[in-house]
Amino acid sequence: MASIFSKLLTGRNASLLFATMGTSVLTTGYLLNRQKVCAEVREQPRLFPPSADYPDLRKHNNCMAECLTPAIYAKLRNKVTPNGYTLDQCIQTGVDNPGHPFIKTVGMVAGDEESYEVFADLFDPVIKLRHNGYDPRVMKHTTDLDASKITQGQFDEHYVLSSRVRTGRSIRGLSLPPACTRAERREVENVAITALEGLKGDLAGRYYKLSEMTEQDQQRLIDDHFLFDKPVSPLLTCAGMARDWPDARGIWHNYDKTFLIWINEEDHTRVISMEKGGNMKRVFERFCRGLKEVERLIQERGWEFMWNERLGYILTCPSNLGTGLRAGVHVRIPKLSKDPRFSKILENLRLQKRGTGGVDTAAVADVYDISNIDRIGRSEVELVQIVIDGVNYLVDCEKKLERGQDIKVPPPLPQFGKK
């Protein structure tokens, strides 16, 4: 049986204890990592057998529902992460939300970094299903933030109206948004804004707390695609990510509004580089430079991001594991978007489309949000290059259709590891 002292030195307890003692949190993170590998997973006895608790998923259409079997549920139901997160908490959002008519949702979230290990028997097959066959049990993820490798990164701005790259980062030693306490959420905010104050040059900016904004200011930023929406999505609310809203939430942006950090929405942080026009290479260069600088500043203050070789960067939703990267453009393609081959072209190019305002919105004036569908198994450079090559292909198709010429469905891109 674990001693009282070893229990004290797990999860959030250790972070708070060492912070109180003035110990470097980087050292704390190292100690927590060692414990995480060695600590026994706690069991939480239940009154009823697993079969009595198994959720009714017969009408569900999400990755969790497809992968969760009675046997897996029975094996994992009583397990608890060092921070106290359970399997039922992981899957609740997928139980409450059966599915999406057009997009197959994941249906589960992680409450902490350890969730992906303690409940790996479910997370691993869900990750494999969601990520085009990426198997975290046998594969490793690579990271590459060298923007100089990008080619053909300038789009035709008659068609491409804006360009954007985003990712997420989680701070090791603190629970993720579905499970974090108020104190942890406020600590995330404090760690982030203290580090961001060190940004210089074109990255320098300021932080705006959501609780200090007027409703009008919030809506203006949302309409301009600078700020996250209010937490009305059932996927967020059922996962517990809207608790205490808007406490410790906010947005940091540079003075040009081309480099932004969202704090405490779905993830601890979301890092975004964006601008009008079609210069994706410049957007990605700023993204890489800013992200590296943010990580350096956070590490200087004794913290680090969650990362491992199996899963890459750890984020709340399994759909964002690996790079967490979504590179997208707003592109006007009135003729191609009406062509019956459009969906197949996107599928083969490993791209996805959304409406002008994002998920669940319509395309206004034939403008679509086109982005990469994959997150893990390919590096950041590879994913951005896929978007660049793919969007250039879409624009070329649009030009051919304007001239009355035929277009072709491209061959499907090879999966990772088959280059």
Swiss-Prot record:
One of its GO terms (cellular component) is mitochondrion. It comes from the Eukaryota. Residues 40-64 are annotated as: Cardiolipin-binding. Sarcomere-specific. Found only in heart and skeletal muscles. It is a peripheral membrane protein. CDD domains: creatine_kinase_like. Its EC number is 2.7.3.2. The keyword Mitochondrion applies. SUPFAM superfamilies: Glutamine synthetase/guanido kinase, Guanido kinase N-terminal domain. It is an enzyme of class 2 (transferase). Its main location: mitochondrion. Residues 159-401 form the Phosphagen kinase C-terminal domain. One of its GO terms (biological process) is phosphocreatine biosynthetic process. The modification Phosphothreonine is found at residue 356. It catalyses: creatine + ATP = N-phosphocreatine + ADP + H(+). InterPro entries: ATP-guanido_PTrfase, ATP-guanido_PTrfase_AS, ATP-guanido_PTrfase_cat, ATP-guanido_PTrfase_N, ATP-guanido_PTrfase_N_sf, Gln_synth/guanido_kin_cat_dom. Pfam families: ATP-gua_Ptrans, ATP-gua_PtransN. ATP binds at residues 162-166, 225, 270, 326, 354-359, 369. The keyword Kinase applies. The modification Phosphotyrosine is found at residue 255. Keywords: ATP-binding, Kinase, Membrane, Mitochondrion, Mitochondrion inner membrane, Nucleotide-binding, Phosphoprotein, Transferase, Transit peptide. Residues 46-132 form the Phosphagen kinase N-terminal domain. Exists as an octamer composed of four CKMT2 homodimers. Reversibly catalyzes the transfer of phosphate between ATP and various phosphogens (e.g. creatine phosphate). Creatine kinase isoenzymes play a central role in energy transduction in tissues with large, fluctuating energy demands, such as skeletal muscle, heart, brain and spermatozoa. Mitochondrial creatine kinase binds cardiolipin. This is Creatine kinase S-type, mitochondrial. It comes from Homo sapiens. The gene is CKMT2.
